[in-house]
Amino acid sequence: GDLTERPTEQRWEETYRGLDSIGQRYPVITVTGNHEYLKYIIRKLERRFSLVFSYYLDSMVGKNQVYTLKYNDMQIFCLDSNREFFYLWTQKKWLEEQLKKSNARWKIVVLHHPLYSIKGSMNNLFQRTMFNPLVEKYGVDLVLQGHEHAYARMTAHGENGEAQAPVYTVSHCSPKNYYIEFDKRFDKFGTGSRYYQQIRVHGDTLTMNAYDATTNDLYDAVDIIKDQTGKSRLEDRGKEIPEALIFHSNGGKKEEAFQKRIDEYKQRKGIR
């Protein structure tokens, strides 16, 4: 989501230039972000988005921009988390239908707003209420999210505390960074930089590697390993990679509070 800063002619031209070399070599799979929407009482998607990414024209479900695609043994479910509650309810029914009939070994859900926010526990409550029970019920392996302009990864745990799917990631590639909360449920954070993920499936293993986009250095890495019964276990290779919490304060109250949260988190994790 948020492929364009604002749905205007100038901003769309910037988006086209940025996508030009990528779109000629790779298929571009998108979800809608809040910046693609026009701000009315009922939000309205700017018309050019569906014309550029024309698969949306074939996948309208109750005026929701949702679709699913399958690639080999992986199925991706793309949601529109920007909508009002009654539209999210329609998406919930669609997602359950799609997950219920899916026979894919690997399932990935993609949406703009994180189901577990790193900006505050009450943020995105409608999205979490609608979609997360389905993520857990139908064995989704990976949830890819954006919007909150930092990096974070949260891993589910079984009854005995063992790490397992689903894995939730929040990421962004914008020069703008947010003052986030360091929720104890998350395994890893990154602030003050940009990030991208590379996901590969090989046999019984799905690998997610996250990179710092400014250096292309590996920043986080997890392997989801699935047995023949569909039960998964997780290998956290990212815990051996140091966390980078970069922040330069100019002395404002919000900045001072964020610096305090960083210091408390570092103390909790034993980060120097």
Annotated model-derived regions:
Residues 1-3, 102-119:
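Short acidic, glycine-rich surface-loop motifs adjacent to enzyme active sites
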Residues 9-103, 122, 130-131, 142, ...:
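Extended active-site neighborhood of metal-dependent phosphoesterases/phosphodiesterases
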Residues 246, 253, 257-272:
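C-terminal luminal/periplasmic domains and tails of membrane-associated envelope-modifying transferases
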